[in-house]
Amino acid sequence: MLHSALINVMVKAARRAGRSLKRDLGEVENLQVSLKGPANFVTMADKRAEEMLYTDLIKARPGYGFIGEEGGTREGADKSHTWIVDPLDGTTNFLHGIPQFAISIGLQREGTMIAGLIYNPANDDLYIAERGKGAFLNDQRLRVAGRRNLGECVIACGLPHIGRGDHDLSRLEMTEIQNRVAGLRRFGAAALDMAFVASGRLDGYWERNLSPWDMAAGQIIVREAGGIVSGIEGDDDPLKTGNLICGNEFVHAELVKILKPLGK
């Protein structure tokens, strides 16, 4: 499949950083049994991957801004374009040698996401989307699942880390959703949860207190697969609020109906 020059830039950068992370994953697995543990090693792997992505993306598109999880915001001469990057989404999974992690690259133009990529180096799954051109997994066109009965749906969520977020609210939300769906899952990588919604593997996903790099790429991939993405209020911008719901039109509306009142 032929890609645009922009997508080719993103794919090339992601694959190079992905090779580094895959090598590092092997070392992480070895460190599981050591007294020192892999935490410091994973921190360095995360930073190394971000620098590789920054180098490749800015070399290809000089002047673009860059927002990364590790390095923060780096201003560019071109104020209208900004890369939004998570070099290692699912860090805790990676830390434990669980192959559910991803590189996430989104490109924003004047406040609108125009391209997104999510890449899992562990299994080589590559999700891409460009505004108006559809979403793809390994060159296969994606569509969100079409289920319209919540009782048949599998929904994913995120959980707040220790010392962060509202744990009581999280438990309440999970209880309310679990009572209505076929299954509730927590995989630990927001970008991949969104990619799974885009591919129809999951019917919906919600999470609070996300950062822009967690969901920038996933947002456009879900939308280009025919899904709806919003904040938990239903009409707000998740990149600004940090709270996100996505799914097909029916599932999205049902999740908003259930979750919106709980956060009041």
Predicted segments with their positions:
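N-terminal subdomain of lithium-sensitive/metallo-dependent phosphomonoesterases centered on the IMPase/IPPase/PAP
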Residues: 1-88, 228, 250, 257-260, ...
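Residue-level signal for inorganic ion chemistry
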Residues: 21, 46, 57, 91, ...
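Short glycine/threonine-rich catalytic loop with a Thr-x-Gly-x-Asp
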Residues: 46, 94-97, 184-187, 191
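Generic detector of well-ordered alpha-helical packing
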Residues: 47, 51, 70, 87-90, ...
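An extended, acidic
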Residues: 143-264
